[in-house]
Amino acid sequence: MAGMTKQRLQPAEPSRGETLDADEVVFLICVEANPLEVQAHLLCASLRRFGGRYKDAPIVAVSPRPALALSPTSQAALEALGVTYVSMPLNETGSPYGTINRIVTGAWAEANLPQPYLVVLDTDMIFTAEPCFLRADVGVRPVDMKGSATGGEGDPLDDYWTRLCGFAGIAPSTLPPLETAIDRIAIRASYNGGFMVVRRDLGVLRRTRDIFFASLEENMRPLAGSGVNVFASTGLVGVEASEWWGSSQAALSIAIWSLTLDVRLYDNRYNIPAHLLRDRSWPLPAGYEPVLLHHHYPLEREYHDPLLGTMRKLACSQAVLEWTQAQLAGLTLR
């Protein structure tokens, strides 16, 4: 993997010209009438409370499967936070792999929203401090674990990645080396799909859709036959959906490097995998607090204490802890 282009790391203190203004961004999430509802409310409320310069930026929440559109009550709760809610038939695949929602919603947003930058987030996230979004074609975080990624030639998954690269017209060697965030394994670039900042007119998300749907047409499941049943923030996703796990991130990573070299890696303050830190440390830049937690927890009562415990471990401020605890207590009443 020697000789590949390296991604640029996010500076701890970017200059004013490197930072996106609030009127340049729109936040994009997917939400459905399932456990995502309460997660979306918590995420949007945290942005409004702790988002700093971005706290009043527009948020668009999309239900891409109208059969799972939000109830009027849930819609009103999001609208009270200044969220624009959209329900339209973007995902008509019938696939149990729910991440297709994010793929088709991102492609729709690139074609239809006016802001020059999209901040695409999974719903199972919480802002704990003001973010700083960088003026780059793409901003991302590495995947947490190797999972469906490839370490390069000789890796059992390299043929899968090579075929995906072919859909984008690039060689696998185009993908730069990267280290996974948790298990620290060397891989070809694979980015977490739950946090990305993309320049809208570049078309990364539409190309991601095209690559993924080409793989769907060929039934290319990276974890086919593994027997894995992934536990996600909506619960166990099922064996069939699990066989596709990581495929959206592969398509995204290949789409990025087929279109640009201007890629920024955000540091450890962003997309913190809270669900994996109960028995692990998580180094933060000296003197800085966590910004964005990706908790991956269903928000039932049994997961509140583990989430709050990890937030204390990360040294989230007392104000953030008290606010989150109050929000979680309120969610149990919904």
Would you name each region that the model predicts?
Residues 2-334:
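Glycosyltransferase catalytic domains, chiefly GT-A lineage
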